[in-house]
């Protein structure tokens, strides 16, 4: 793959994996970080805005605290994160300061990108940092996040940040140098894929486990991140960060996989809906409702066959077809209890069941994003309708 001019992008989000930044015995890899910051400073001097999503708080904290390799309890992980976050923020501040740059730490939880009001507030804060020429250094707030309310990996967090901020490139740096047809450590015949035009089910199937002990992510989470990013019009690169100056290495043509952005990205409001990581519930629809959605119509109760989960009006729900495949997400107009009551009913019968005059649509088309497992419309046909071309 020929070199990519990173300075040709307007706003770049760089995600750094824990294993790149932290050595279990020695702690923070300061020389590696210094070389990366040199790259960042060079990009910024060329006019490119840079956001950093930095893993490593727990890994660094457990090294500082001498917690070893054993599996940590939740409270131990959170304590390690508390120690690691301070050390990590100080390291970023010091290295960026060598170039006269200011860093701003932003710690987020799942709710900061999944709840609309907090999403807008987080976006405004980071936008202000960028306007002030500061470098946002973003991480999940592992001191308060629990397994039930967390991203679970910084790949998807980075994709949410990149799309939230309208970035045009996301770079995932880790200990893998791109996408292969199979995990190369297990299959010597695995072939490297330099460019991905669209994240199809076949591409998703290539996502084997590629996580190291110090990181939580693997190739599957990187492909999940790619679905979020590319659907919103953000290109993505998966590259190895093992070499010092990894961004310069990408520009020199080091092995990396480029995921092209969708040619028809969804607008900002729908980007937020489509990128929701944890839908509150699922609504199963019949083929007639699917045809209507593909024609740009709203989802009416008559086409709903099942309702799963506990959700409130305004929550994001996944919409699945008769085979159980997710074909879209949207903001539901009813809470779960009422949705169950009116599933399958004609619009004129709803008021008699609920006892009040209600909305005609279960999910209005303005609050709906069609997206298959690939982040694009599904490549299949439903009774003569070409979903891929709809």
UniProtKB/Swiss-Prot annotation:
The keyword Kinase applies. It comes from the Bacteria. SMART domains: PUA (SM00359). It is found in: Cytoplasm. This is Glutamate 5-kinase. SUPFAM superfamilies: Carbamate kinase-like (SSF53633), PUA domain-like (SSF88697). It catalyses: L-glutamate + ATP = L-glutamyl 5-phosphate + ADP. Pathway: Amino-acid biosynthesis; L-proline biosynthesis; L-glutamate 5-semialdehyde from L-glutamate: step 1/2. Its EC number is 2.7.2.11. Catalyzes the transfer of a phosphate group to glutamate to form L-glutamate 5-phosphate. Belongs to the glutamate 5-kinase family. It is an enzyme of class 2 (transferase). The gene is proB. Residues 280-357 form the PUA domain. The keyword Nucleotide-binding applies. GO terms for molecular function: ATP binding; glutamate 5-kinase activity; RNA binding. Keywords: Amino-acid biosynthesis, ATP-binding, Cytoplasm, Kinase, Nucleotide-binding, Proline biosynthesis, Transferase. InterPro entries: AceGlu_kinase-like_sf, Asp/Glu/Uridylate_kinase, G5K_ProB, Glu/AcGlu_kinase, Glu_5kinase, Glu_5kinase/COase_Synthase, Glutamate_5-kinase_CS, PUA.
């Amino acid at each position: 793959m020929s070199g990519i001019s990173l300075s040709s992008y307007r706003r770049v989000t760089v995600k750094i994996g824990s294993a790149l930044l932290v050595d279990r015995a020695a702690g923070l890899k300061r020389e590696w970080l210094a070389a990366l910051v040199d790259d960042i400073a060079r990009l910024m001097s060329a006019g490119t805005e840079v956001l950093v999503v930095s893993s490593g708080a727990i890994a660094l904290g457990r090294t500082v605290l001498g917690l070893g390799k054993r599996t940590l309890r939740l409270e131990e992980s959170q304590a390690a994160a508390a120690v690691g976050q301070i050390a990590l923020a100080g390291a970023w501040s010091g290295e960026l300061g060598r170039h006269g740059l200011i860093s701003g730490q932003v710690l987020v939880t799942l709710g900061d990108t999944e709840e609309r009001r907090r999403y807008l507030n987080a976006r405004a804060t980071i936008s202000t940092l960028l306007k002030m020429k500061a470098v946002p250094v973003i991480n999940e707030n592992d001191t308060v996040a629990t397994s039930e309310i967390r991203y679970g990996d910084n790949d998807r967090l980075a994709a949410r940040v990149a799309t939230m901020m309208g970035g045009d490139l996301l770079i995932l740096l880790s200990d893998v140098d791109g996408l292969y047809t199979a995990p190369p450590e297990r299959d010597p015949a695995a072939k490297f894929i330099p460019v991905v035009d669209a994240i199809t089910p076949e591409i998703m199937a290539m996502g084997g486990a590629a996580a190291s002990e110090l990181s939580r992510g693997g190739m599957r989470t990187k492909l999940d991140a790619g679905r979020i990013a590319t659907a919103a019009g953000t290109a993505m690169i998966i590259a190895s960060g093992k070499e010092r100056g990894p961004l310069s290495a990408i520009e020199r043509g080091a092995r990396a996989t480029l995921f092209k952005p969708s040619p028809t990205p969804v607008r900002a409001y729908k980007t937020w809906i489509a990128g929701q990581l944890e839908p509150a519930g699922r609504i199963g629809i019949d083929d007639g409702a699917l045809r209507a959605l593909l024609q740009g119509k709203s989802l009416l109760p008559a086409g709903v066959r099942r309702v799963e989960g506990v959700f409130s009006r305004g929550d994001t729900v996944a919409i699945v077809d008769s085979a159980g495949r997710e074909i879209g997400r949207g903001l539901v107009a009813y809470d779960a209890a009422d949705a169950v009551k009116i599933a399958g009913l004609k619009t004129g019968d709803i008021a008699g069941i609920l006892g009040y005059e209600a909305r005609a649509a279960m999910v209005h088309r303005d609050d709906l994003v069609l997206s298959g497992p690939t982040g694009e419309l599904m490549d299949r046909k439903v009774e003569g309708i070409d979903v891929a071309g709809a």
